[in-house]
Design a protein with these regions (language model features):
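A short acidic, Gly/Pro-enriched loop at the edge of an enzyme's catalytic core
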Residues: 87-99
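Class I (Rossmann-like) S-adenosyl-L-methionine-dependent methyltransferase catalytic domain
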Residues: 1-37, 42-88, 112, 130-199
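A short glycine-rich, Lys/Arg-flanked "PGG" loop and its adjoining helix->strand segment in the class I
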Residues: 115-127
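A short SAM/SAH-binding and catalytic strip from SAM-dependent methyltransferases
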Residues: 98-112
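Conserved A-loop
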Residues: 11, 105, 122
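A short, aliphatic-rich alpha-helical micro-motif
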Residues: 29-30, 93, 118
């Protein structure tokens, strides 16, 4: 079973499990204007009404995007939805004014593919645009004893999700290598959360 099939399988239960947006995402999006990209949006956990802004949700799971569309309709939020791989985004260069990349980069298999996804994000952001990033932290109490940075984590009986565990320096360097400047870092806990700007 490939990862698209796994996430399609768990989409319904995941949507019920991940209901409320993370507080740090709400704070980051507050007051944002223009086009906002949600990379690896899943079922639309972070979908919200933002005055003077429009959200674009992209995920490689068709089932997740279907659920996100239902959520948007229920909440009466106008948004755009795409089923696409994060290594090949279906958007023009310099299109987005801001982005969120929460708990999805670490789900991409292969170092080259993760690098490509960050480069694609850089391509579609406008100069000066910021992205909030969140990935699992290899050095957190939860994962400190993990023998490998690559893990497959089961979701009940629906399949195993791929995760790559970053350490803080590694993820910061990945974004800097792509041309970003790190402008804010939260103290890493279970998640490494930071804001990067396209310069």
């Amino acid at each position: 079973m490939n990862q698209k099939q796994v996430w399609d399988n768990i989409a319904g239960e995941w949507s019920e499990f991940k209901i409320h947006p993370a507080h740090h995402v709400e704070e980051f999006l507050k007051g944002k204007k223009g086009n906002i990209l949600d990379l690896g949006s899943g079922s639309g956990r972070h979908l919200q009404k933002i005055p003077k802004a429009k959200m674009y949700l992209v995920d490689f799971s068709e089932k997740m995007i279907e659920l996100a569309k239902e959520k948007a309709k229920k909440k009466k939020i106008s948004a755009e939805f795409s089923v696409a791989d994060l290594t090949k985004l279906p958007y023009e260069n310099d299109f987005f004014d801001a982005a969120i990349f929460i708990s999805s980069l670490h789900c991409i298999e292969g170092e080259k593919n993760r690098e490509k996804a960050v480069k694609e994000l850089f391509r579609v952001l406008k100069k000066g645009a910021q992205v909030e990033v969140g990935v699992w932290n290899k050095d957190s109490n939860k994962f400190r004893k993990a023998e490998s940075k690559e893990r497959f984590v089961k979701w009940r009986d629906k399949g195993a999700r791929y995760y790559y565990l970053y350490d803080a320096d590694e993820i910061y360097k990945l974004f800097e290598k792509a041309g970003f400047k790190i402008v804010f870092k939260e103290d890493p806990k279970q998640m490494i959360i930071f804001v990067a700007e396209k310069i």
